[in-house]
Design a protein with these regions (language model features):
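N-terminal leader/targeting segments and the immediate start of mature chains
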Residues: 19-41, 47-52, 196-200
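Gly/Pro-enriched, hydrophobic low-complexity segments
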Residues: 124-128, 132-200
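Acidic/charged, solvent-exposed loop-and-adjacent secondary-structure segments enriched in E/D, K/R, S/T
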Residues: 92-114
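Bacterial N-terminal signal peptides that target proteins for export
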Residues: 1-9
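Structural recognition of beta-strand segments within beta-rich domains
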Residues: 51-55, 60-65, 69-75, 80-83, ...
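Short hydrophobic/aromatic-rich beta-strand segments that constitute the beta-sheet cores
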Residues: 42, 69-73, 88-91, 98, ...
Length: 200
């Protein structure tokens, strides 16, 4: 009986220890918010029910703390976007043009920014968050709270390590989008051109 109780005691201690060391949302937020600047490449796959093959687009991105996100689409067409606290802007021949806040994809782009910057408090306003894994390999599941978001998304799955690696958006109508962030680096400062893009 003594051995059994000791085993139970050891098990309880192990459980408490693992709970104390559990990777939580606060730690994830701090981890993702650490880098001042992140440069990387992305591949986006849009799976539409009506099409047998996904629509694939590729490009590069720059995420800068206190500035926002530059989303530079290279293929199948070239188009630059800037997502910041001011809203979403698209570059044309005359410079950056702010898009209407209710434009298609505006909510999705704001969501990307919150995810990449580790803004869990911002995400918690709109989603139930469930985190699993550890600092090196984690997965975050977002389930919409609001009626509006429930009309668009069933669920959003985000996974990564030091930085975000993959974002998967599962839409209510059966379509889905998978974003893969590749070759992300957090050591390089903003170039003069990038600083100019954020300042405009």
């Amino acid at each position: 009986m003594n051995v059994f109780l000791k085993s139970l005691g050891s098990l309880a201690l192990l459980t408490l220890s693992s709970l104390a060391n559990a990777f939580d949302l606060q730690q994830l937020s701090e981890q993702l918010a650490k880098p001042d600047v992140i440069h990387g490449q992305f591949t986006q796959e849009k799976h539409l029910r009506a099409l047998p093959q996904p629509l694939i687009s590729k490009g590069s991105f720059v995420l800068a703390k206190n500035h926002g996100l530059l989303w530079l689409l290279k293929t199948p067409l070239q188009q630059d976007y800037r997502i910041s606290a001011k809203g979403i802007a698209r570059r044309d021949a005359t410079g950056w043009q702010l898009l209407p806040n209710k434009s298609a994809g505006a909510e999705q782009n704001r969501l990307f920014l919150a995810v990449l910057q580790g803004d869990s408090s911002g995400l918690q306003r709109d989603f139930e968050l469930a985190l699993s894994g550890d600092a090196q390999q984690w997965q975050l599941t977002l389930t919409p709270r609001s009626v509006l978001l429930k009309q668009v998304f069933n669920q959003i799955n985000i996974s990564g390590g030091t930085l975000v690696n993959t974002i998967e958006l599962l839409e209510t109508q059966g379509d889905s989008t998978v974003l893969r962030m590749q070759d992300s680096t957090a050591g390089q400062p903003l170039s003069d051109a990038e600083q100019h893009d954020f300042a405009e």
